[in-house]
Amino acid sequence: MAQQPKPVRRIVCIDDNDSEKSKCISDAPSPDVRLDPARPGYASTRIWVTDRPPGRLKNVRESLNAPHTIEPPPGGSVCRVVTFPPDASYKGRVGAKEVQAFFAAMGSPAASTYSAKAPHPYMQKTRTLDFCLILEGEITLVLDKEEVHLKAGDTVVQRGTNHAWSNRSD
């Protein structure tokens, strides 16, 4: 049985409208988590979403009310924490149907570049600039021409390339 992903603590701070003093309005696990039934242990946890740069600072409502998609809103941004289960827990049991269902559920069906010949079933490509920080453990960035082994503290700048993330641990 796959281990449940660890909740991600989300702290949201603002300046009080009346006193202009800073305070926390939320300190709890992020309420916006999407799982993938085909990959037990996978979790996409959104922390914050903006609908335009640089993001409003005053009179902002909860940002997670926007649809939970892979791509940010047009002109906006998204901060998320993703947990990847070991590939062994799903690889060989996941095909086009499951992968397409995942990308459709995440609001980005066109992002999937699934092919039976692809180096990983969850290959994807979006027109986004992604900053990926490895928080713990190790993971492999799968690209069309190569793979890059990453460890905690490594950072990837993903510039709209075809890629997947592969957790090759037990």
Task: Enumerate the predicted regions with their spans.
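N-terminal leader/capping segments at the start of a protein or of a new domain
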Residues: 1-63
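Short Gly/Pro-enriched turn/cap motifs at secondary-structure boundaries
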Residues: 2-3, 70, 121-123
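Structural motif
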Residues: 21, 138, 162-164
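Conserved short histidine dyad/triad with adjacent acidic residue
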Residues: 29-30, 78-126, 159-162
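Terminal, intrinsically disordered low-complexity segments enriched in charged/polar
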Residues: 46-70, 78-84, 91-94, 101
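Ligand-binding loop in jelly-roll beta-barrel domains
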Residues: 75-77, 85, 147-152, 160-170
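A short beta-strand-loop-beta hairpin characteristic of the jelly-roll/cupin
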Residues: 118-152
